[in-house]
Amino acid sequence: MGAYKYMQELWRKKQSDVMRFLLRVRCWQYRQLSSLHRAPRPTRPDKARRLGYKAKQGYVIYRIRVRRGGRKRPVPKGATYGKPVHHGVNQIKFARSLQSVAEERAGRHCGGLRVLNSYWVGEDSTYKFFEVILIDTFHKAIRRNPDTQWITKAVHKHREMRGLTSAGKKSRGLGKGHKFHLTIGGSRRAAWKRRDTLQLHRYR
């Protein structure tokens, strides 16, 4: 086994004494920093490499802090002006994951970079911390490499805003496995339409 495989196994046992101590100290450190800052290197190099990171020019890591918990509907004094069924203000759950929110914030802050992927690095009772991999698409090391040329195309601008990253696709119900096989047809709406439309074939 290579070194990264050993690191992967360490991260899989988050309740071990070593990892509990490390995560606790790191969370304290991250809380002292600003909510969005550039990290000099990935905290989890094994995970970052699995998600496409390379330790070369053109790749950037940003660490994002996101507040945990549900979403409160932003209405003045709870006045939603509607029917009682839609009066909910406090116990509203956001449709997307906090990881995709972190990606979006990084993408907004670094408008000239493209969001490749992200991963979890820690959490406490108030915050979750994610590291986002961003790519400088105008760097020659990226543009000249056939493996990374795909992200330089204009169609991938702000892919994190349109649910095209891994975290975004998961929130859209797209993926492989038993969690996602009900989303047939490309989207939840298409799957619903397909199931809910009565088809009366001529020869049946």
UniProtKB/Swiss-Prot annotation:
Signal peptide positions (record): none
Listed GO CC annotations: cytosolic large ribosomal subunit
Segments crossing the lipid bilayer: none
Chief localisation class: cytoplasm
InterPro entries: Rbsml_eL15_core_dom_sf, Ribosomal_eL15, Ribosomal_eL15_CS, Ribosomal_uL23/eL15/eS24_sf
SUPFAM superfamilies in the cross-refs: Ribosomal proteins S24e, L23 and L15e
Compartment annotation: Cytoplasm
Biological function: Component of the large ribosomal subunit. The ribosome is a large ribonucleoprotein complex responsible for the synthesis of proteins in the cell.
NCBIfam families noted in UniProt: PRK04243.1 (NF003269)
Protein name (database record): Large ribosomal subunit protein eL15
Organism: Mylopharyngodon piceus
